[in-house]
């Protein structure tokens, strides 16, 4: 009886690397103080890294968008959270 052993791996071929996914283009799309129209996307994100504030809606993929025409304001929400709001008038910094 003759026993023939074969290699587990194929002897030749390309490497098993060389794949990458397409970038998702996430991040802040409108900056603080910028005028936006209702429906404009403010932030594209995965999870609620930034929370919706006044006059801001949230999509099923956690995208934040303006509900009214106005000015974008990034604010703190408590100690460790951020939120973005849209106000009809520009907020003036108090001195």
Swiss-Prot record:
Disulfide bridge positions per record: none
Biological process annotations from GO: translation
Propeptide segments, given as residue ranges: 1-6
CC terms in the record's Gene Ontology section: cytosolic large ribosomal subunit
Keywords from the UniProt entry: Ribonucleoprotein, Ribosomal protein
Modification note: The N-terminus is cleaved by ribosomal processing cysteine protease Prp.
Top-level taxon: Bacteria
GO molecular function: structural constituent of ribosome
Recorded family membership: Belongs to the bacterial ribosomal protein bL27 family.
Annotated PANTHER family: LARGE RIBOSOMAL SUBUNIT PROTEIN BL27M, RIBOSOMAL PROTEIN L27
NCBIfam families linked: L27 (TIGR00062)
Name the record gives this protein: Large ribosomal subunit protein bL27
Gene coding for it: rpmA
